[in-house]
Amino acid sequence: MSPSKESDELIFFVNGKKVTERNADPEVNLLFYLRKVIRLTGTKYGCGGGDCGACTVMISRYDPISKRISHFSATACLVPICSLHGAAVTTVEGIGSTKTRIHPVQERIAKGHGTQCGFCTPGMVMSIYTLLRNHPEPSTEQIMETLGGNLCRCTGYRPIVESAKSFCPSSTCCQMNGEGKCCLDEEKNEPERKNSVCTKLYEKKEFQPLDPTQELIFPPELMRMAEESQNTVLTFRGERTTWIAPGTLNDLLELKMKHPSAPLVIGNTYLGLHMKFTDVSYPIIISPARILELFVVTNTKQGLTLGAGLSLTQVKNVLSDVVSRLPKEKTQIYCALLKQLKTLAGQQIRNVASLGGHIISRLPTSDLNPILGIGNCILNVASTEGIQQIPLNDHFLAGVPDAILKPEQVLISVFVPRSSKWEFVSAFRQAPRQQNAFATVNAGMKVVFKEDTNTITDLGILYGGIGATVISADKSCRQLIGRCWDEEMLDDAGKMICEEVSLLMAAPGGMEEYRKTLAISFLFMFYLDVLKQLKTRDPHKYPDISQKLLHILEDFPLTMPYGMQSFQDVDFQQPLQDPIGRPIMHQSGIKHATGEAVFCDDMSVLPGELFLAVVTSSKSHAKIISLDASEALASLGVVDVVTARDVPGDNGREEESLYAQDEVICVGQIVCAVAADSYAHAQQAAKKVKIVYQDIEPMIVTVQDALQYESFIGPERKLEQGNVEEAFQCADQILEGEVHLGGQEHFYMETQSVRVVPKGEDKEMDIYVSSQDAAFTQEMVARTLGIPKNRINCHVKRVGGAFGGKASKPGLLASVAAVAAQKTGRPIRFILERRDDMLITGGRHPLLGKYKIGFMNNGKIKAADIQLYINGGCTPDDSELVIEYALLKLENAYKIPNLRVRGRVCKTNLPSNTAFRGFGFPQGAFVTETCMSAVAAKCRLPPEKVRELNMYRTIDRTIHNQEFDPTNLLQCWEACVENSSYYNRKKAVDEFNQQRFWKKRGIAIIPMKFSVGFPKTFYYQAAALVQIYTDGSVLVAHGGVELGQGINTKMIQVASRELKIPMSYIHLDEMSTVTVPNTVTTGASTGADVNGRAVQNACQILMKRLEPIIKQNPSGTWEEWVKEAFVQSISLSATGYFRGYQADMDWEKGEGDIFPYFVFGAACSEVEIDCLTGAHKNIRTDIVMDGSFSINPAVDIGQIEGAFVQGLGLYTLEELKYSPEGVLYTRGPHQYKIASVTDIPEEFHVSLLTPTPNPKAIYSSKGLGEAGTFLGCSVFFAIAAAVAAAREERGLSPIWAINSPATAEVIRMACEDQFTNLVPQTDSKCCKPWSIPVA
């Protein structure tokens, strides 16, 4: 054989164009290369860890053996460019654009209202596009699997799924209630349209068809390259790492002998994360992706041999094919593997992660290794000394030195045997989320019986997620051999395993009791599964099994969500050109879908631009003894290090410093920043800054700590009505308790982003920032630099999600960057990594609510005394406003005649918490709903009856003495009861629960009264600038910021109506403090209200100027009138202004008319829980919302759905975990789980109530951006109802309050049974726990 040649030339294609790189840097990933090198910015950075899908691209390769081209999606943030030799990459720009033509996927996701902020949209588009390249008519299951690796924080997924579903060969709909016609295609005649309810948000028939022949062809040059000899070693040398990709097995083995410590990389899904988050680098990395022997598939009578290089998707496809061809008794192991592969990671990760990498990494949460370990699988390994076989058993998985690969050995393939007739294998896993989440605990279990008996001859049980490695219950298994498979064996096995499978207190990951309970619960499920199969083989030989028990073996199905959205159609007499009230597509929808929408970090890098990385505190409360940045300053590419000493003006606001100076008050506080010529260099240098601390006591982390040390921010707030103490004495019953609500991360898809560009004279600066409040950012930067605000111009084109998290924080971060820009005299780009964003910026306030309720036996509440404590973190931020709002809105929909509410903000050593969608209402009203449920349980009454009994019924006054009319509240409630068929379904739930022991359903209906607005009058003002050009085109600028909530779309609609011109004439450029100064924050659901009035005012001014010209020439065109106005020297630009509602609260008197109006609503949700694992399935949700006269029903319904799913996450999924020292563990989607596409309700119906006038807002509309968040608690209380049903059946006492979020752990441990009782309770006093609740 001729010696292998060496080449340093990397060749691949991007969107049909050839890319050639010599000595490519192995540490450069595809995402960076696309965005910063070849300037394709449609692919977005969302997390950097492959978990969010924002950077999804399609990769295509040609296989010279099969002569086939494969297409697969991948997350570009984890793909090293060196791995792309011979590949074709397709990005969102490559499939369509507004400059050429848009692709059907792009069109449908945009016109189907599947975009809001648009940051996740390119990734969604590319996931769907790749699926269609492989399956032009996909199944619904394929769509759900495909989208499982993509996250969206705005839409609630329903419109995205619906857009994708339009490509299925047949889509389900209501069929006109059985008439056999599609509701989306039904046209109504004019008389029927008058005052009718519409259910069509877009015209499906307008979609262009999918034509697979029009896609990009695979480059012929790459086909020729693949056909050529593999006798080439590719070598790419970077700054710190050399990448070597051999072409033959001999070359690979020689390299591994020469570099035994060099890691092997194919998918980079493990090593990439390890290198990124630990800053570990390897001198040599070897890529065996071109070694044909690693991709072998051999199927014999003995079993399957699977190449170690096969991706998990390829393994899944192979196993599916084999299982379809063999009898079930031979495929037990294969079926178990398939079950795990369906939910292991997201589709993009499964497409690139290799089987061998999954095995060799030996991660404790590996889903496949426990099955392979009990399946007598064999590892075929090779070295220069020859081939060797290593058993893949518990010793290998535990890392026993004699049982694992030697450094010079390479895993070639894995042999997975077929199962025998009397062999039974099962797999189990429970994760925080159904898809794309590491398992909390998983297991592989196998039993072999003596032929035709139930006598155990072999037993194997392996658990993942219990210890530092996959662990075996080997001792228990050996003791059970020879026993019969019966209940006595099960009881003994549970006790043995509970004793053997130990989990120390404070074990990493926490949840010690829950994890041990899962281990035993899985054993019981295995027992039932095997018993069921034995019974199937011989119905007479084995005892009957109650159907009430067998239901636990049914996994929650992966079903596609569907629903109906209904709203009031516009009057049939309304001109077609008038867009108000119509479901108009998001103004930037197409640009979102094509990747052409420009976000802050998409802007081109200027010559000399520097990148900023911050150094944050590692201590919660400490004195800074010394700071040594000398090593960082000497690092490659570093220009400067910026500290508090460099701040020329104010170093922050109130108690919040830009740069910590003498003391740090939380983990994550910015101490200094490194400016370098690349982000990588800045990051690497930042890690070299040495800071010496001295701890300061006390360290306050939790609300309880704050209460102990009386550590508060601001005064106690209090509201009271009636005579509370007297009413308590008259009550039949009194109930006291407390409830805890965890915090929530904003998780906007675009992390905090800012660019600061010094203009070179008069200290002027342009600031491009992702902010809800450009004027506040301008003010903070000006104060920091000690210059007037007129030298600072803030630009906000669009924001990739905000939810309150980009109101005050961007001002702080922009100021940090501005100091660096002024010091260096160069442009600064400061984009937070997801981990840093979550660490630094805070989120929703965790809450402790204490309540005392006095009520009558019929459920009527006479008195309530409620005390709220929120964890504000280390600085005030907006915390005082949040507690005020929580108190003002706490009563929700209920008239409690004697009510006292008090609230305090606790000052702790956590990062400062801040504004979040709902602003205190989701926390405060949750406490009230907990009280309602507790009263219902105590009185043994239906919860809905207690809620109805206590609701406002007539015009009345709130606890802060503001009058309101509850008519629409009651209508929403009644409509929700009717739309959801509540009482019929409640009966069905009861019947379901009677038939099942281990699965229970619950249903709950929750009303809502949401007060819209800010607490001060000055917030209700806005300005706009409308300019008409001589060609008739119109440019609109206003003070609101496009966050994804559709404000720009609505402003164009307003201008279109007022100017009586088509929307196509109107353009919005950006929000800028030059065009519209002194703006207020875009938030509190008022953005469209106030800015719409300002745009309306400006347009009316212009129309009044044009009025004489129009009267003189009534038959003229818009263009003619505009030109004539110019000829007559009439100004064609106008500033509109709106001064709105008077809103002031007198806390001394406890009263104030502070809210312009109320939004009413109701939601009914049904869930199903698995009592053995704690998993739950959201079956159906019906929402009715009072939106008055919606300006844009598509936008408003999208806001309701997105807010609801965000609330669903708050109350059931999203859990921030802190160490006792105040360190946030959950710093990315890897650990922190927001709702994914499989978490939303199977049926998801949203109805806008029949409109009624609302004179306080433009066109009688209402702001609906926040209200739906709280309605997510309907899922929580449905879960609570299901748990209550389980506890009642077990003879347990009711639980008055379940803490939020109702995670799988909370659900499982509340459903107490014989298995939870086996697990000894941990004593938190004996040692420090791994994590603690902070409220």
UniProtKB/Swiss-Prot annotation:
Domain of life assignment: Eukaryota
Effect caused by changing E1266Q: Loss of activity with different N-heterocyclic compounds as substrates. 60% reduction of activity with benzaldehyde
Residues noted as binding [2Fe-2S] cluster 1 in the record, renumbered to the chain: C47, C52, C55, C77
Signals that turn on the gene: Induced by testosterone.
Gene Ontology terms, MF aspect: 2 iron, 2 sulfur cluster binding; aldehyde oxidase activity; electron transfer activity; FAD binding; flavin adenine dinucleotide binding; iron ion binding; molybdenum ion binding; molybdopterin cofactor binding
InterPro entries reported for this sequence: 2Fe-2S-bd, 2Fe-2S-bd_dom_sf, 2Fe-2S_ferredoxin-like_sf, 2Fe-2S_ferredoxin-type, 2Fe2S_fd_BS, Ald_Oxase/Xan_DH_a/b, Ald_Oxase/Xan_DH_a/b_sf, Ald_Oxase/xanthine_DH-like
Reactions catalysed according to its record: an aldehyde + O2 + H2O = a carboxylate + H2O2 + H(+)
Residues the record marks as active site: E1266
Domain FAD-binding PCMH-type intervals: 236-421
GO cellular component terms given for this protein: cytosol
UniProt keyword annotation of Phosphoprotein present: yes
Description of how activity is regulated: Inhibited by potassium cyanide, menadione, benzamidine, raloxifene and norharmane.
Impact when changing K889H: No effect on substrate affinity but decreases catalytic efficiency for smaller substrates like benzaldehyde or phthalazine. Increases substrate affinity and activity for bulkier substrates like phenanthridine
Subunit (UniProt): Homodimer.
Protein name (database record): Aldehyde oxidase 3
Species annotation: Mus musculus
